[in-house]
Amino acid sequence: MQAMSIRIFLILFILILIYPSASPAATERRIALIIGNSAYSSGTLKNPVNDAAAMASQLQKLGFTVILKKNANLRGMEDALTDFGDRLKRGGVGLFFYAGHGLQVGGANYLVPIGARINRESDIRYETLDAGKILDEMANANNGLNIVILDACRDNPYSRSFRNAARGLAIVSNAPVGTFVSYSTSPGKRSP
């Protein structure tokens, strides 16, 4: 695992240890959706699929039920999110991990699936997964602890051509109570 992934895992491990319902008796209430997208037509990213697989393996050791998607298109990401939402249970722990391309437009974060065709700003809402949908699923479950880890702050290839695009990802301000959001870099910045 990369150094950043190890840091994320350590933070995650500490959160799970200190959260009361994360005891061994509550392991059936831990659900994680892990998505790693590497095989983009604009160029393959080296680490996302490997990081997703490593994170899934570690979470399974911590008693999570894991939904793992590698190189998912939009439909695959949406179906996985629906499955994740259906499995979340009140009082449990929900975790979402994404590694791949992400972008910020108009203050909202979007996760870029494999096969996305984004030629103009208006394509974003039809060709990407709005990160707000993940928070909506978590809010609907009313879990005591939600963890969102976004390793998606790479260069936004559209930031120069789209009026409302910005570098990096936006700060999440509408997360449900009890939600921990972690980025691979500071909001508004990009990672190498």
Which role fits each region the language model picked out?
Residues Y19, G106, A175-V177:
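Short, solvent-exposed loop/turn segments at the edges of secondary structure
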Residues R29, A72-A99, L103-S161:
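Caspase-like (clan CD) cysteine peptidase catalytic core
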Residues R29-N37, S41:
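Mature N-terminal segment immediately following signal peptide/propeptide cleavage
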Residues A22-T27:
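Boundary at the C-terminal end of the N-terminal hydrophobic targeting segment
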Residues I8-Y19:
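Bacterial N-terminal signal peptides
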Residues M1-S5:
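N-terminal secretory signal peptides that target proteins for export/translocation
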Residues G36, G43, P48, A56-L59, ...:
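Active-site-proximal C-terminal subdomain of hydrolase catalytic domains
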Residues N47-K89:
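N-terminal, post-signal-peptide region of Sec/Tat-exported proteins
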